[in-house]
């Protein structure tokens, strides 16, 4: 059952990510939508890991499946390199800084909230 829940969760996460990507028509919108996706995914993963709610199958379906399919480190990495290549090193720096600091802060906030609610 865990394999099935991870597969279904992953499919739903990828579809959600794809849908948001289709809504962002311009390069700059895509860049910041990736930040939003990764930061919100970090918060939710922290929340679910610390909260310990649900059974193992659903937790892994959400965490390993949906949130892993929804968030994307590879897109983050390539977009940062593309900004540098386009002559926008400061935009690349801001993108990386906001992504990393925002992701860590969101994960910490989600984790703290999950522990408090558990």
Regions found by a protein language model. Give the residues of each.
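Membrane-interface helix-loop junctions in multi-pass transporters/channels
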Residues: 1-118
């Amino acid at each position: 059952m865990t394999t099935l829940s991870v597969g279904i969760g992953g499919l739903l996460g990828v579809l959600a990510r794809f849908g948001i990507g289709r809504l962002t028509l311009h390069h700059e919108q895509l860049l910041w939508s990736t930040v939003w996706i990764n930061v919100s995914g970090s918060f939710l993963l922290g929340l679910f890991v610390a909260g310990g709610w649900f059974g193992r199958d659903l937790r892994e379906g959400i965490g390993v499946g949906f949130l892993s399919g929804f968030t994307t480190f590879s897109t983050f990495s390539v977009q940062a390199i593309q900004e540098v290549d386009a002559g926008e090193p400061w935009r690349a720096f801001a993108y990386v800084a906001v992504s990393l600091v925002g992701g860590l802060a969101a994960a910490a906030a989600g984790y703290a909230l999950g522990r408090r609610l558990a």
